[in-house]
């Protein structure tokens, strides 16, 4: 754990060299980077951490600006500049950090990313609500979301299963199409996330006043965008928005891959990140 001045964040650090910071997805925690952290720390100073209110980090009630926590973590670890590797909404936080402090970020790798200010299609949001209510009845779900109830383990397991099928796998796929260890790890992280979220003080992300959706043209650092071709099409569209909006960005498409390539295709993603980081390191 490290005290950033505003909270306490659980983190791991290994290796020496140029700094990279791995920012996990909202449906996971820092363990989703197990393979990448171990491999990349051979040549880089690798850092991974849990968001505030996630994993081993401190709880928080009320609004939280995760991109500011990321920059505060870099300050606490005396990292002046880093490549940020962010997945899902961790990618959104990485981009917001880069826009808030462009001198602190020398490259971005965005894996199935989210985006601050992006307006999700109503059909996508409606499907998510329907799936949640199919897993847990409305009355209990409302109580859980207020963080003032003891969650029923069967509700936790049901919600984790639904979320894993909807987001991690993607439409029309079955768990058998994912390596068993990847499916098990995804379910474990989701179960622990819901068990904690539903029994802890309620917090909500607070996004920058000037969101990334209107500022992609300001990003000039090398940017790699990774898209899983089996994940929800509306999430794939966000990756496309990044590649269209960031000049010179590169898109990597991974077939038969859902929302967490770091878990489902660890070797492929690690190789792609290593090649990208090597290019960044060799830039004049």
Give names to the regions the model predicted:
Residues 67-82:
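Conserved acidic catalytic loop of the alpha/beta-hydrolase fold
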Residues 38, 205-257:
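Conserved loop-alpha-helix segment in the C-terminal half of the alpha/beta-hydrolase fold
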Residues 1-20, 42-44, 79, 203, ...:
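Alpha/beta-hydrolase fold catalytic core
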Residues 245-284:
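Catalytic active-site module of serine/aspartate enzymes centered on a nucleophile-bearing elbow/loop
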Residues 5-59, 66, 73:
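Conserved HGGG/HGGXW glycine-rich cap/lid loop of the alpha/beta-hydrolase fold
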Residues 86, 90, 94:
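Gly/Ala-rich beta-loop-alpha elbow adjacent to hydrolase catalytic centers
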Residues 147-201, 205-206, 210, 215:
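Conserved alpha/beta-hydrolase catalytic His-Asp/Glu region
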Residues 99, 106-152:
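Flexible "cap/lid" loop of the alpha/beta hydrolase fold
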């Amino acid at each position: 754990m490290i005290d950033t001045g505003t909270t306490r964040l659980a983190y791991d650090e290994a290796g020496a060299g140029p700094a990279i910071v791995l920012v996990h997805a909202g449906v996971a925690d820092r363990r989703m980077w197990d393979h990448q952290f171990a491999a990349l720390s051979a040549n880089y100073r690798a850092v991974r951490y849990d968001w505030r209110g996630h994993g081993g980090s401190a709880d928080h009630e009320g609004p939280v600006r995760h991109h500011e926590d990321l920059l505060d973590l870099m300050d606490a670890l005396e990292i002046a500049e880093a490549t940020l590797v962010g997945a899902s909404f961790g990618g959104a936080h990485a981009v917001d950090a880069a826009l808030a402090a462009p001198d602190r970020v020398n490259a971005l790798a965005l894996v199935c990313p989210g985006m601050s200010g992006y307006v999700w299609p109503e059909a996508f949001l409606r499907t998510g609500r329907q799936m949640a209510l199919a897993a847990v009845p409305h009355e209990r779900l409302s109580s859980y979301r207020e963080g003032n109830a003891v969650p029923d383990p069967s509700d936790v397991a049901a919600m984790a299963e639904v979320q894993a099928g909807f987001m991690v796998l993607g439409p029309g796929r079955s768990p058998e199409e994912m390596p068993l260890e990847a499916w098990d790890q995804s379910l474990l992280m989701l179960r622990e996330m819901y068990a904690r979220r539903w029994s802890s003080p309620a917090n909500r992300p607070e996004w920058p006043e000037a969101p990334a959706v209107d500022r992609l043209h300001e990003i000039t650092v090398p940017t790699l965008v990774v898209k899983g071709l089996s994940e929800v099409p509306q999430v794939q569209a966000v990756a496309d928005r990044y590649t269209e909006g960031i000049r010179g960005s590169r898109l990597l498409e991974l077939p038969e891959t859902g929302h967490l390539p770091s878990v489902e295709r660890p070797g492929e993603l690690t190789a792609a990140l290593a090649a990208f980081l090597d290019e960044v390191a060799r830039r004049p």
